[in-house]
Amino acid sequence: NIGTAYFGCGGFASDGSRVFDPDLFEENSQYAKMIEIKLSQGAKPGHGGLLPKEKITKEIADARNLPWPVLHDCVSPARHSAFSNPYELCEFINTLRTLSKGKPIGMKLCMGHPEEFAALVRAFVETGEAPD
């Protein structure tokens, strides 16, 4: 599954933030049966999640593509950096589908406002790009 920190399919930008890496995603997608995009999964609304560095083992660091030894807490941002609106999400879905050679794309989401879900559906209909 793909969350905001892009573990297993991302790396670090020059400012230290986590970003999606298409090459790493394509390489690792061969081991997946499907792709799941996680939306609105921050541990605290608007703040994302935090894994203290003391709890990060070598195995966790390897799985999350973090440098070892880990010197900083691992932060999952509140929002995705690969897209910022429903139409860009549709483009991201198309990118994932292409890079994974047609694997099914799903979404896991939690919405606080019905209009947010309506905006997603409207973008899916208008672009023809949607989860499977």
Which residues fall in each region the model found?
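Active-site entrance/lid segments in N-terminal catalytic domains of soluble metabolic enzymes
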Residues: 1-132
